[in-house]
Amino acid sequence: PNNAMKENIIGLDASAYNLENGKIVRTKMKRDVVFKERVGESRMNLKFSIPQVKAGTLIEYEYRIESDFFFSIDSWKAQSDIPILYTEYNVTIPEYFKFNIEMHGAEKLETVNENASLNLSIGSQLLRCSGTHLNFQGNQLPALKDDSHVWCADDYCTQVNLELQGIDFPGSLYKSFTQSWEQIDETLLKDSDFGSRLKMNNPLKEEMTALHLEQMKGADEKICAIYTFLKNKVRWNEKYALYSKSPKQVLKEGTGSNADINFILISMLKDAGIPAYPAVMSRRDMGILPYSHPSIQKLNTFVVAISPTDSTLVYLDSSVENGYLNVLPPVLMTNRARIIAPDNHSQWVNLENVGANLLRSSVKAGISSEGVVTGTRETVYIGQYASRLRNKYRTAKDSTE
C-alpha cells in the first residue's frame, strides 16, 4: 500500500580506479548496471556492477538510505573481506530520539559529534528542532576474513550499532523502547508462535501410550524414549528457528525446523511429568548476544532444557539425528542461553561444556616368538564422538566404510 512504511537506497554512485601507464584512470559506473532483485514479499536487493575491476583496482562507492523505520537503524560495519582504504558513516539524530550507541571492534574509528539544526516531518507538520550529527571515519582498515577457528567473524568486526532507547516529543509522555531481559521473557511467553506452543496439549498423547513409560525406572530413560519416538515421526529439515508453525502441520508433513520439533518434544515431556523449557540463544555462527543491552532481535533459536530432578538440567535439540542427553551440535553450544520459564524463573546457562566428550582406546596385544603382533582393540565413544560415529554408521553405504 502507498502508506506502508518503506526504505529506499538513493544517490548510489561507484567508480573504479586503475593505474595505467603511470596515471590514475577513473571509470564511473553507468546506470544500466544497477538493478533490483526481489528476495521476498516485502524485501528487494539493489545490485550493481563496478566496471574495470581487476587485481589491484581501487573501488569507491557511496549511497544514502532513506528509511521510515526510525526505530531500527542497521549496524554499520566499517570492515569487509577486502582491505578498506577509507570509509565514512554519517547519521543525524533529532533531539527527541534517544539512542544507545555502541562501538566495538579492534580497529580505531575517528569520531566527530556536532550540533545540528534540522526539519522533522511529523504527519503534515514540519517541526524545526536541534539534533546531533555523528560522523565516523575509518582509515587503512585491514581485511576481516572468515577463519575456520572463528564461528562468527562479525563478532570481531569494527562497527557501530544504534538501538532506539526512547522518544521524547514535546507535549507527549516519554515512550521507552528499552527492554529488560525480563520484559523479553514476557514478550516471548505471550507470543502466539512461541508462548502459546508451550501451553499446547501433547499432539501425540494417544500414540505415546505405546511407549509404556510407567514401566521405565528413571527419568533419563523416559526422556530418551520420548525423543527417539518423536524423531521417528518427524525429520529435521536442517533449519534452525525461534518460532514455530502449527504442530498439526509439522506432523502431517513429517518434517520441520528444530523449533517446530522442539515445541512438540516439550509438550510430550510435560505430559510425562518431566518439566521442560526452551533455552533461547543466538547461534554461534550468528554472533554473540550483546552484553550492553537486551535484544530480542538477536535471538534466533532454542534448545530444550529438561529438569529430570529439582537440582539437575539436561539438554536436547531435535537437530541431532543420533544424539543423547547433553549432546548438542557445536553451533548451539553457546556460553549464553536463557531458559524461558514462567513466574520470573528464567535464568542464564552456559552450554559450552554441558556433556562429557570422550574417545578412549585400549589395546591388548602380544608378540609371538616369530615376531607377529596379535591382539584386540576396544574403543569407547562418549558424547559428541558417539553421535558422530552413529551418523557415520547410519550414512555408510556398506560395512567397509
List where the protein language model places each region.
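Second-shell loop/turn segments in exported
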Residues: 45-49, 208-216, 248-255, 390-392
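Short, conserved helix/loop micro-motifs enriched in His/Cys and acidic residues
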Residues: 235-256
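Structured core elements
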Residues: 58-60, 90, 135, 277-278, ...
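Lumenal/extracellular ectodomains and adaptor appendage modules
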Residues: 1-88, 355-401
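Secondary-structure capping and boundary motifs in well-ordered enzyme cores
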Residues: 51, 218, 222, 250-261, ...
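Secretory-pathway-linked proteins and extracytosolic
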Residues: 54, 66-71, 75, 79-227, ...
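Short, solvent-exposed loop/turn segments at the edges of secondary structure
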Residues: 43, 54, 84, 129-131, ...
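Hydrophobic/aromatic-rich core segments of domains that either
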Residues: 260-343, 348-349
